[in-house]
Amino acid sequence: THLSTIFTENRLKKYIELRSMDTCGWDCLCSGPAFYIGMLYGNLDEVYEIISKWDNNKIINAYLEAPQKGFNTQLMGKDLLHWASILLDISKKGLENRDILNKRGKNESLFLNHLQKVIDNKLTNADHMVGKFSISEDLSELYDK
């Protein structure tokens, strides 16, 4: 059907289908799937303990604000960088515990390296793209008002 061509952020079928990250280079292609796998095979109770306290309206507001504010977007009184760091740690533990190794003996947590760099540098892919513009350039026209 034509409805199957609609690709929202995620779709629930006989499996969960997630949209990949946008503006993603080769170094981060596997980061998104690895992040979710790490949480699913990690401590779901720990993740649930965190997100169960989040208000649905605040989640939607953060989702809508994130393209403009990036890591400075607030969710439940903390910025997204805070939440990203916590959830990435949980995901990393999940992948380490899963202990699936490559030929070099490294576990799947290596796929999270790109996300860890983003958090450590506090710069998103969008921040890097905006950084290519002149400091004096007014980028507000890029956003709907």
Language-model-derived ranges and their functions:
Residues 1-145:
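C-terminal accessory/tail domains of diverse enzymes
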